[in-house]
Amino acid sequence: MLENRVKTKQIFIGGVAIGGDAPISTQSMTFSKTADIESTKNQIDRLKLAGADLVRVAVSNEKDALALKELKRVSPLPLIADIHFHYKFALIAAQSVDAIRINPGNIGSKDKIKAVVDACKEKNIPIRIGVNAGSLEKQFDQKYGPTPKGMVESALYNAKLLEDLDFTDFKISLKASDVIRTIEAYRMLRPLVIYPFHLGVTEAGNLFSSSIKSAMALGGLLMEGIGDTMRVSITGELENEIKVARAILRHSGRLKEGINLISCPTCGRIEANLVDMASKVEKRLSHIKTPLDISVMGCVVNALGEAKHADMAIAFGNRSGLIIKEGKVIHKLAEKDLFETFVIEVENLAKEREKSLKD
């Protein structure tokens, strides 16, 4: 685990701590109509199962806002109301949810912001100042355009508004749709405020595009110690947002959990259907939370070397293969018997590690 994380003010969204020494949380956003409580609840359940810590829902009209009371009652995750344009929906939402997200570029005048702050104070819930490069306030857009500087100036202006209202339970996000502006904006703002940061690349695209952009932008920031909560925005299945987010946390040294799959890129030496085997291993072992390095290699050329550094490895030969545990060969089996035996051995190793931690 990296030790260079920037320590920020800690806030709470429901029972989830954001900032300070708290783990970096992951979140997603439902795509159902929020007033459709059954559909929205089903999506929240899916996110909970995928490992999300928080969930955000769109509040597009009064019907959505009024549905939040019941949705909060049935939600297994802390609930964040996402408000654009209509501050009165935030006033209704504040009576039920765990946090409010506002976009300073479209929420309205200082008086409207004050009304939202007063409602959040009354219920003791935090606010996210959600700055987007594509919807900056007119004065910042005209002066700076959709640049990191414009985003930072907007964030500072709105942070000062909240501070002047004696409200400091907030976090900040600075989202652009590309890697460079996103990184530059967060880097620029970090030394200027103590508040926690919500990381994200907005409108990042489909699974492939978003995974690349998010890994570069969010992973880069996380390795610099920047970031307290995050969302990977993907045009696609909800669960993928959490899966990719947690992978970024693991590989940036911010989360020690689960399987780290090591597999070779294939070449003419492979002795099995390695692509299929690596996919099967990853899927079957996805439930394991114990941090383990697992190697799946198509031949013995690199397998033995990799196995020295892996917790468990499988190496294919000619219609057979080796299972290697902590650098030692424990099985030589026919290819048809390798997969199930390997899965059992990995699961047993995970149990051993968990038991040793408890002891």
UniProtKB/Swiss-Prot annotation:
[4Fe-4S] cluster binds at C264, C267, C299, E306. Binds 1 [4Fe-4S] cluster. Its cofactor is [4Fe-4S] cluster. It holds the Pfam family GcpE. InterPro entries: Dihydropteroate_synth-like_sf, Enolase-like_C_sf, IspG_bac, IspG_bac-typ, NO2/SO3_Rdtase_4Fe4S_sf. Converts 2C-methyl-D-erythritol 2,4-cyclodiphosphate (ME-2,4cPP) into 1-hydroxy-2-methyl-2-(E)-butenyl 4-diphosphate. NCBIfam families: ispG_gcpE, PRK00366.1. This is 4-hydroxy-3-methylbut-2-en-1-yl diphosphate synthase (flavodoxin).
